[in-house]
């Protein structure tokens, strides 16, 4: 459609369909008797892979690659105080530099209080052929975590987050228990000095 690139995914937000393509997204509304329709386009909003968007309680979560030099993680949501046709692709990743990753097999997912994106790391400007990095954002605090998880797809099963391994035909349960299963843990967290609310 109109040089928007290949169709990738479709999601419903307040009885309106949003059709994501590679370079553009369309807002499709139809009447109840199916005699009339509108198809409004949103320039510069697009996804590179069918799994690069997902339905979330607040809207549609997606990795926007319409501007390849400025990739952003966004949430398409209804603007507060407006009708259900007025949406905004709000960036949730302004403090992240996402230009050093590839998104050919990007996965977006919402699990509990986490908005998750899995992407390909670039080494010497060459992208891995598989997802090798996970970004997880806590929606309550807004804090991002970068994890070395190799994930090709995500799904929730009885509350647990199940990940398809991007290097093998295996499934993993993520964020469960305290056992590292013999893996080397390369993730770390650095924070500022804090007295944790005490005067001492």
Where are these regions (language model features)?
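Surface-exposed extracellular loop regions of Gram-negative outer-membrane beta-barrel proteins
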Residues: 18-42
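Beta-sheet repeat architectures centered on beta-propellers
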Residues: 5, 15, 35, 44-200
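Extracytoplasmic beta-rich repeat domains
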Residues: 1-8
């Amino acid at each position: 459609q109109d040089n928007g690139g290949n169709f990738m995914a479709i999601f419903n937000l307040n009885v309106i369909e949003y059709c994501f393509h590679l370079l553009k997204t369309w807002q499709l509304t139809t009447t109840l008797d199916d005699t009339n329709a509108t198809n409004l386009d949103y320039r510069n909003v697009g996804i590179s892979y069918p799994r690069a968007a997902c339905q979330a309680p607040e809207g549609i979560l997606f990795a926007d690659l319409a501007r390849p030099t400025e990739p952003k993680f966004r949430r398409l949501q209804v603007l507060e105080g407006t009708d259900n046709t007025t949406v905004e692709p709000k960036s949730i990743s302004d403090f992240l530099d996402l230009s050093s990753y590839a998104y050919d097999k990007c996965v977006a997912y919402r699990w509990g209080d986490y908005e998750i994106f899995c992407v390909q790391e670039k080494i010497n400007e060459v992208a891995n052929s598989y997802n090798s990095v996970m970004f997880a954002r806590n929606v309550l605090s807004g804090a991002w975590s970068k994890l070395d998880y190799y994930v090709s797809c995500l799904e929730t099963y009885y509350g647990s987050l199940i990940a398809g391994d991007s290097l093998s035909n295996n499934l993993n349960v993520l964020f469960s228990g305290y056992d590292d299963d013999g893996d080397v843990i390369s993730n770390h967290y650095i924070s500022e000095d804090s007295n944790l609310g005490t005067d001492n």
